[in-house]
């Protein structure tokens, strides 16, 4: 049996998080990258939003909240609560 390849496809894919801000307010790394604790970007290091609409890497804000007695947004100092996906 003889197989002939008539064409070769070169594919490229890209992804990015749908975030209005370019970088995390805590670690200052881009959201399309990853936080300083992660080795590769992706679903293990997603951005999360507070009700104040500030976004941070999930690992960064969790570390911030665990290190601070007051549960406040690092940007505006309002009480930190995770924004729900529900409307």
UniProtKB/Swiss-Prot annotation:
Pathway: Protein modification; protein ubiquitination. It holds the Pfam family zf-ANAPC11. The keyword Zinc-finger applies. It is found in: Nucleus. A zinc finger (RING-type) spans 35-77. InterPro entries: RING-box_E3_Ubiquitin_Ligase, RING-H2_APC11, Znf_RING, Znf_RING/FYVE/PHD. It comes from the Eukaryota. GO terms for molecular function: cullin family protein binding; ubiquitin protein ligase activity; ubiquitin-protein transferase activity; zinc ion binding. Keywords: Cell cycle, Cell division, Metal-binding, Mitosis, Nucleus, Ubl conjugation pathway, Zinc, Zinc-finger. One of its GO terms (cellular component) is nucleus. One of its GO terms (biological process) is anaphase-promoting complex-dependent catabolic process. Belongs to the RING-box family. PANTHER family: RING BOX. The APC/C is composed of at least 13 subunits that stay tightly associated throughout the cell cycle: anapc1, anapc2, anapc3, anapc4, anapc5, anapc6, anapc7, anapc8, anapc10, anapc11, cdc20, cdc26 and cdh1. Component of the anaphase promoting complex/cyclosome (APC/C), a cell cycle-regulated E3 ubiquitin-protein ligase complex that controls progression through mitosis and the G1 phase of the cell cycle. This is Anaphase-promoting complex subunit 11. The lineage of its organism: Eukaryota, Amoebozoa, Evosea, Eumycetozoa, Dictyostelia.
């Amino acid at each position: 049996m003889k197989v002939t390849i008539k064409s070769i496809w070169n594919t490229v894919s890209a992804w990015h998080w749908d975030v209005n801000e370019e970088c995390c307010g805590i670690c200052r790394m881009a959201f399309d990258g990853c936080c300083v604790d992660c080795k590769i970007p992706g679903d293990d290091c997603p951005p999360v939003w507070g009700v104040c609409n500030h976004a941070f890497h999930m690992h960064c804000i969790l570390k911030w909240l665990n290190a601070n007695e007051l549960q406040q947004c690092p940007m505006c100092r309002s009480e930190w609560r995770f924004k729900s996906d529900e409307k």
